[in-house]
């Protein structure tokens, strides 16, 4: 119930305080996070990875000023929308959503998958995405060992 109240406040803010462009980005991000979450839960990873891009390749490291502005707008839309989704929208959902939204706008990205062990010696997985020289979601992977990367 608490999450619904937060979602309604966010929706009210979205309706009255944001530009039409931002409203469309937030709406796109909201629905895409749901689609990506569904894919993660219901599609075997062997099939899902084919949708992530070219395995073990990197995207270009330069961005134009216009591309940078688009990247930051999409980043903000996805990160902020992910706080209010009724489903779990963590790193992989966010990375896949950003990748899809930027790819739709002809901006290439590299999606990284990494692992490390926490203080209890438990394996932890993480996903982050880079566009140009900007780490868009998930930070720069810091302490995670990269096990796969996909360029799209």
Which residues does each PLM region occupy?
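Hydrophobic/aromatic-rich core segments of domains that either
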Residues: 77, 96-152
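Active-site neighborhoods of divalent-metal-dependent phosphate/nucleic-acid chemistry enzymes
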Residues: 83-84, 88-93, 97
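N-terminal accessory/pre-domain segments preceding catalytic cores
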Residues: 1-63, 70, 79-87, 140
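Short, charged low-complexity intrinsically disordered segments located at boundaries
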Residues: 59-65, 69, 105-113
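A sequence-level detector of short, solvent-exposed, charge-rich linear segments
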Residues: 30, 46-50, 54-55, 93, ...
């Amino acid at each position: 119930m608490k999450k619904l109240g937060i979602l309604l406040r966010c929706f009210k803010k979205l309706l009255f305080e944001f530009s039409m462009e931002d409203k469309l980005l937030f709406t796109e991000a909201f629905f895409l996070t749901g689609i990506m979450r569904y894919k993660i839960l219901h599609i075997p990873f062997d099939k899902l990875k084919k949708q992530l891009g070219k395995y073990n390749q990197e995207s270009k490291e330069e961005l134009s000023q216009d591309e940078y502005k688009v990247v930051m707008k999409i980043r903000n839309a996805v990160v902020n929308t992910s706080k209010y989704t009724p489903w779990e929208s963590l790193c992989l959902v966010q990375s896949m959503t950003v990748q899809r939204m930027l790819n739709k706008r002809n901006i290439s990205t590299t999606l990284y998958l990494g692992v490390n062990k926490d203080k209890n010696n438990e394996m932890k997985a993480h996903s982050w995405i880079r566009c140009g020289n900007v780490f868009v979601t998930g930070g720069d992977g810091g302490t995670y060992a990269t096990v796969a990367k996909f360029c799209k």
